[in-house]
Amino acid sequence: MRHYEIVFLVHPDQSEQVPGMIERYTSAVKDSGGSVHRLEDWGRRQMAYSINKIHKAHYVLMNIECGDQALEELTTNFRYNDAILRNMVIRCDEAVTEESPIQKAEKENRERKNRAERRAAEAAAATETEKSESEESAEEETSTDTTGEEE
């Protein structure tokens, strides 16, 4: 069996059907005795150029190991499925299981946003604490002033 990297683009109006498509294609590979080494759903993204006046598509990446029959079945399914705008199949020398650069970049961006949100929340909490402490000290000063006048 050989290793393949497959990327296919799904019409944006059919995005809700992507999990079903992925399940169908992975089961076709597994039923033929192959295996899926990596599966990444990149989501809806801007395309480099428009296809049939469509500017966005749902991207899916699969790294599989399968025989010729299973690959032929997959490419036939891609060809006759109107929801698939483009597909690309590349033969690889070995199985690729690590995250793709796109997935890594998205993960880093999410982590950066989370860190920035945490910092902002901590800063807001710190300023809130300072305000409450200054209000408490101001109240204490006014209460001591009023008690001093009564005596």
From Swiss-Prot:
CDD domains noted in UniProt: bS6
Keywords for the protein's UniProt record, in alphabetical order: Ribonucleoprotein, Ribosomal protein, RNA-binding, rRNA-binding
Annotated segments matching region Disordered: 98-151
Any one Gene Ontology molecular-function term assigned to this protein's record: small ribosomal subunit rRNA binding
Domain of life of the organism encoding this protein: Bacteria
Function: Binds together with bS18 to 16S ribosomal RNA.
Family statement: Belongs to the bacterial ribosomal protein bS6 family.
Name used for this protein in its record: Small ribosomal subunit protein bS6
Protein encoded by which gene: rpsF
